[in-house]
Amino acid sequence: MVLADVIKRWKQISGHEAYLATGTDEHGMKIQQAALKEGLPPKEFCDNNSNKFKDLAEHANISHDFFIRTTDQEHKDVVQQFWLLLKARAPEGLGLYKGKHEG
């Protein structure tokens, strides 16, 4: 996030329009396992981590323009619209990906 902030500021100083979007990915087995290890429900675990991440950015004077949580309804709506747009523009016969998401 620090490097992204440096690049954003450099672009702005250089006369370019630049934005920094950051946030937290709050889905997947890693979240479930970490929440279980902490003895917290996944939502509470994510709320805590998201707040820590925001505090860290503030203390480091990182100037993000957008903070996105993958559990936010606005994020879900945008992703849904994106996938619908892709589906509408996809070549005929394009199949669905079925596989493991976690790395």
Task: Label the model's feature ranges.
Residues M1-G103:
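N-terminal, positively charged nucleic-acid-binding surface of large information/translation enzymes
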